[in-house]
Structure formats: structure tokens, C-alpha cells
């Protein structure tokens, strides 16, 4: 948006993005240069892309030769369920289809340690890494190696990261349970809204009648409950149906 890109919202279902629309746009229009994906516990509904969706991403035939899939795995280990979702490895699938240059994958510890002072990771093909390294040479002289060392000494290894996430889960799951139990008790009998019960991530997505989300958020604010602005998770902040409300059990 900041750089002048036209942002096109893609409808989502329980399997992820509508791949018929994605494939049509990507294969027919060379001005379509990329797609941004949060493949696990995706905002706002907490959806994890199905195996079929990941495989269809890996098999894309873009009209634009420089088309890239931005695979933002922000919630890769952010579980709140004892039966966490499993996401297929897109790079493995892209290798099978000869599309290794398609995905650029990244994640960070911003929701694990401290936002803005964590550690980020990026994975891509050698071709993509070569381009990215060249650009980073002009952006930063040296990385914050002391912060990297802090994280290594704190976590020690991958098992240490998972053990730390169990502590997050103990804090977050009761909050999610309160929100979901309240929705079940107060709204389900009225039949005026629907929601999903995510296995992870940081949010609960509630869908109300079309054209009423902004008004609902405004009424909640008048009652003393401040919610995330309606449409916040959509490109340009515009929910085409004005029906989605994102609830953050993590705050407070």
C-alpha cells in the first residue's frame, strides 16, 4: 500500500484462500507481482492452509516472471490447542514442481520474546537469497549479534523455544476459553454471529450480519469495550462485506 501497490483481497474459506481466483489472477495478469500469505492461523479467522492449497500455491504458473509468494509464517509455533494444526512445507512442494524461486518465507520472535527487539529468520532459494543479500548490504552494516546471542543463550535450542511457547499457551488458553465460552453463551442462542475456534494464533474472528461490523464495534466502544477496528485485517482496512470483527483475547 505504501509503495503504491494495488491490494486485492482474496476470499478465504476453511482451507485457505480461494485458489481458483488466485490461479486466474496470477496466470492471466503479469501486473500481479506477488501474494502475501499468513499460512498458519491466518488472520482473521485462524485458518491454516490445507495441503491442497499449499500444493496449488507450489504449482502456480505466474504470468509475471518475478512473481513471488510472501510466506509470512508469523504464528508457526503459536499453539493454544493440544491438537495443533499441521502446515505443509511449501518449499518442499515447490521443489517438486520446479518452482523453488516462488516462495520467500519468513518468521520472527516478535510474538515469542519482545516485539521490535526479537530475531527474524528468512528462507528462500539461492537465487532469491542472492538478490536479498545484495539489497541488505545497503540497508544495514551489521546485524545485532548481541541480541542474537541473547536469544540463543535464553532458548539454547529448538526444544527450548517450544518449552517457552508452552508457557505462552498456559497464559493464553484460559483467555481464549473465556472469549469463546462467552460467545457460545451470549451470542449463539441469538443466531446473530458466527465464529471459529482456532487451534492457535492470537485472535478470534467473529462474523456478524453484512454491513454491521463497524456499527457493532462503535456500540461496543460506547459500552466501554474497545475492539480492533472493523476491517483491520483487510487490504486498505476495507472489509467488502463490513461483517468481520477481530477479537484479541491476548489484550488485556
Description of each model-found segment:
Residues 14-85:
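Active-site phosphate-binding strand-loop segment of PLP-dependent enzymes
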Residues 166-180, 192-207, 221:
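Conserved glycine-rich beta-strand-loop-beta hairpin in the small C-terminal domain of fold type I
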Residues 216-222:
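Short amphipathic alpha-helices in soluble, non-transmembrane regions
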